A protein has these predicted regions:
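Catalytic-loop region of hydrolases
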Residues: 2-16
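Serine-hydrolase catalytic machinery in alpha/beta-hydrolase-like enzymes
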Residues: 23-131
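Primarily recognizes the serine-hydrolase "nucleophile elbow" in alpha/beta-hydrolase
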Residues: 124-153
């Protein structure tokens, strides 16, 4: 039985450069709990001076990027669980390969390789974040769920 691939691919960039990979971390969406108030929202760069440390959820977004639903969920997690939430932003790469499903498995694997690199970098870099207390879990949704599930420390 032949599979009909009715999805489509957009974008030309199929591999990270050191600069595009770094941008996924530096521009990550970060939410920190805030006792008595709304969670604090910013980027890794904006929280360089933060002094209070928290356990963290490193959350891998789906193929739609850091969309409004991801932001709401991250803020809820930070507030409800009193954890830092960091969402590396893979959409920082201009003209990055994206898709609408279904496409051949080889095309998904190109994207999964990029996403795996982003998560690996995040797990290295988070150790240097002043708001990180050394405890982390990894989670994700959809395309990001595959990234989280495949992660090997």
């Amino acid at each position: 039985m032949a599979i009909e691939y009715t999805g489509s691919l957009q974008g030309k960039v199929r591999a990270h450069t050191p600069e595009t990979l770094a941008a996924t971390w530096l521009n990550a969406y970060v939410v920190l709990p805030n006792a008595g108030g709304a969670p604090k929202v910013g980027t890794v760069e904006e929280f360089k001076g933060e002094t209070k440390a928290y356990p963290a959820v490193v959350f891998c977004h789906g193929s739609s990027g850091v969309n409004p639903q991801i932001k709401i969920f991250a803020q809820w997690l930070a507030d409800a669980l009193r954890v830092a939430v960091v969402v590396p932003d893979s959409m920082q790469t201009e003209d990055r390969l994206t898709y609408s499903s279904p496409v051949p498995a080889a095309d998904y694997e190109i994207i999964h390789k990029m996403r795996s690199q982003e998560l690996a970098l995040a797990m290295i870099e988070i150790k240097h974040a002043p708001w990180f207390d050394g405890r982390a879990i990894i989670a994700g949704t959809s395309e990001g769920g595959v990234t989280a599930a495949r992660y090997q420390a």
